């Protein structure tokens, strides 16, 4: 019986799934908000939250563990220098999933995944001359 094995396979092979989640983690760390399908967003949340928790304590061992998962030096640097200190006092729940309707082509449920304490970019108001 498969009790307690709630891994979403996302209709991919294990290597494809791991590579996809690795790319999505790197994109989320770089941009702090991404748009994806809802099942991918829920699976991304399961892998990115432990990475941010790992980054709260900066050590060589933790950086090596993060690099083993991310395989991107810039992402590891931003994770430990920016995101780790930012979420130091937060005991979890670093991401937010916002449902945003359905995709036009195949009606797949779409969602935004964003970091909770993301610095909001100010709206640029256009003035008519």
Swiss-Prot record:
Pfam families in the cross-refs: Ribosomal_L17 (PF01196)
A single GO cellular-component term on record: cytosolic large ribosomal subunit
GO biological process terms, semicolon-separated: translation
Keywords in alphabetical order: Ribonucleoprotein, Ribosomal protein
UniProt-recorded Gene Ontology molecular function terms: structural constituent of ribosome
Family classification: Belongs to the bacterial ribosomal protein bL17 family.
Subunit and partners: Part of the 50S ribosomal subunit. Contacts protein L32.
Name of the protein described by the UniProt record: Large ribosomal subunit protein bL17
């Amino acid at each position: 019986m498969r009790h307690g094995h709630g891994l979403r396979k996302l209709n991919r092979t294990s290597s494809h799934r791991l590579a996809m989640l690795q790319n999505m983690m790197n994109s989320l760390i770089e941009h702090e908000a991404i748009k994806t399908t809802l099942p991918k967003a829920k699976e991304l949340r399961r892998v990115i939250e432990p990475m941010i928790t790992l980054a709260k304590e900066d050590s060589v061992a933790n950086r090596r563990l993060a690099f083993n998962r991310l395989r991107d030096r810039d992402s590891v640097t931003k994770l430990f220098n920016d995101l780790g200190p930012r979420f130091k006092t937060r005991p979890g729940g670093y991401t937010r999933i916002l449902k945003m309707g359905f995709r036009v082509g195949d009606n797949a449920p779409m969602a935004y995944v964003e970091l909770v304490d993301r610095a909001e970019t100010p709206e640029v108001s256009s003035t008519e001359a």
